[in-house]
Amino acid sequence: MKKAVHFGAGNIGRGFIGEILSKNGFDIHFVDTNKSIIAELNNRHSYEIGIASSEHEKISVKAVSGINNSENPEAVIEAIAKADILTTAIGPNVLPYIAELIAKGLQKRKEEKVQSPLDIIACENMIGGSEFLEEKVSDYLSESDKLYLSKFIGFPNAAVDRIVPAQKHKDVLYVEVEPFSEWVIDASHLKNKEIKLEGVHYTTDLEPFIERKLFSVNSGHAAVAYSSAYKGYKTILEGLQDEEILNILKAVQKETRALLLAKWAQYFKQDELIKYHELIISRFSNPEIIDEVSRVARTPIRKLGYDERFIRPIRELNDRKLSYQNHLDIVGKIFAYHDENDAQAIQLQEKLKITELPMLIEEVTGLSNQKLILEIEKVINHYKK
């Protein structure tokens, strides 16, 4: 049986990546620090996924096990040495923390003279996730290790899309997911050309698809979340039942379409993007999914990043002299976001009290364009509570 190592036994790992790997006949080693999840994976070697639709379909995922990387790093290294594919779904901020362990696994492959190619695919909400992970892994490799890596190890970037709300069940392994899913892999950077996962789309130019997903799904979801939080709604579904918030989402989508068409006209057509955005609205409005605003709005400082879901489109729309007012509007609401259970939300509000606004905007967004900084300052003051 083919072997997969997957970092992150959370909801996306089990509810999306695990499902695809299982359907493709992989024996999956989930790597995580959650003791109860790892124990259950090793006890049962299977779990169930529920599809959040009117049919309430159930999918069984089998041939799974767990390794606690903080308690048993050697077992992770051993698993990487024998793996046919390695994937992650742990969050962009956590990738640097698994780099050393992956490096040791690759060094073991080299020591054991493993010449079968291995692709390492970061399934994260970021542009260039696998590339970023490769940089972090390379920090722990010697020159001869890097030579081995260049011959046998691939880091193809990927785009993943599936809504998996925060949830709690008696069964710690059970996870509910939306029916829609999309996983796109950059085929041009694959080392193992023989593994083609069913249920995955392969392309030789991933960037337009990553941007379409990030600027449409991530930006759109966050636009609904911060607008809903500003008006006091607790769930995405509640927020979208407010016509004002639905119209805000549509206005953000319109700006996104303008940017995607300006950049990627050879890949996308206006009518196709309109249908894609209408599908996203129906996904966000799925009555079977109760998605907390706090989940979608969490880590506001990260979401204000230079290459993130609002600042990057604003920069690129500005460069092309296209409208970005609705994206800008959401940035103002992010700075007004309060959540006493979110460390970044607390930190942002504390920074607002003690830091000059232009300096804070520059620090958080990475912007140096004074026109954009001034515009953000105005919108922050507008939404200040």
Curated annotation (Swiss-Prot):
One example of the protein's molecular function in GO is: mannitol-1-phosphate 5-dehydrogenase activity
Could you tell me which NCBIfam families the record lists for this protein?
A: PRK02318.1-3 (NF002647), PRK02318.2-5 (NF002652)
Q: Which GO terms describe its cellular component?
A: cytosol
Query: What is the protein name stated in its UniProt record?
Result: Mannitol-1-phosphate 5-dehydrogenase
Catalysed reactions, semicolon-separated? D-mannitol 1-phosphate + NAD(+) = beta-D-fructose 6-phosphate + NADH + H(+)
What is the top-level taxon of the source organism?
Bacteria
Gene Ontology terms describing biological process: mannitol catabolic process
Write out the similarity annotation: Belongs to the mannitol dehydrogenase family.
Residues the entry annotates as binding NAD(+): 4-15
Name the EC number(s).
1.1.1.17
Read off the InterPro entries from this record: 6-PGluconate_DH-like_C_sf (IPR008927), 6PGD_dom2 (IPR013328), Mannitol_1_phos_5_DH (IPR023028), Mannitol_DH (IPR000669), Mannitol_DH_C (IPR013118), Mannitol_DH_CS (IPR023027), Mannitol_DH_N (IPR013131), NAD(P)-bd_dom_sf (IPR036291)
Cysteine pairs bridged by disulfides in the record? none
According to its UniProt record, this protein's enzyme class is oxidoreductase
Establish whether keyword NAD is in the entry. yes
State a single Pfam family of this protein.
Mannitol_dh
Keywords of this protein's UniProt record, alphabetized?
A: NAD, Oxidoreductase
